[in-house]
Amino acid sequence: MYKRQGKFWYLSLAHGNPFGKLVKYSTESNEVVDETTLGLFPASMQVSTTTGFLYCVNFNLHGSMKPSTVSVVDPVTMTEITSITTGSMPHGSRISPDGLFQYSVAMMSGELFEIDALGLEVNRTLDLENKMMKNDGMKSMDGMKSMNEMKSMDGMKSMDGMKHSMVKPTWVIPHPKENLAYIAGNGSDEVIEVDLDAWKVSDRFKTGKGPYNLEISPDGKLLIGTIKSEGKTAIWNLDDKKLLGEIKNTTSVSHGIAISSDSKYAFISVEGIGGEPGIVDVINLETYELVSSVEVGKQAGGIAFWKKDI
């Protein structure tokens, strides 16, 4: 991730002893300028153009599932100002276009969190579970013949005292022009649209298996999603939710998305498996075709677009 002024870029290092850290680099030399310790498994992050603070979710893959936090950092002094408790395995830290709110989803507790970027506290929480899915799950439980199976499930619930989401949301992206947000339901194979004014789910539409990251073109017309389990990238028209294209990525495990400022190209990081290199695929958003690829380091993950120079 980079700051809008372009002097520095930032990297979250998830693994630590036990905590991860945030590292600040110079864009001129790509050398480390500073670093600071965050929480357990820091992951996605973004800087608010209004507050100037950096908001990083602490995904926390360690031990039993429990509520984790969002770290708020002053990127100038590289000081963690505070940490805000949200849900279990928070991911997909994204800021509203006006810079006033930070959004993240809790993968294992199935919730959307809105944080007041100025007040530095949780403003609203939304349960993303589909009631129909819940009912189907209960019917499945009622149909179990073995009491041992029921006891086993009760034991799983009591281990950490938290619900286990069927949606398993992994990403949220606010619309650049409308008061809507879109969420990747990695477990339910869907995109969830949330009306931020009414604070409720306004639409759901199915995807391929395991949608992971989402991004919206700067002109607000297209939604791009990585379909991680299938190694594909999907493109939807946001006016009618129609699938415009589904592109097979160059290798397996599609991950991050960055879109050019002119809304013409999407850059997709693809992790690869085993000894394969990571790859960045370039997709033309006018023809919905893969136009180029470049090999990068193994297990390519986060990706950002800085600016377009002509």
Enumerate the language-model features and the residues they cover.
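Predominantly soluble domains enriched in secretory-pathway, periplasmic, or organellar proteins
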Residues: 3-310
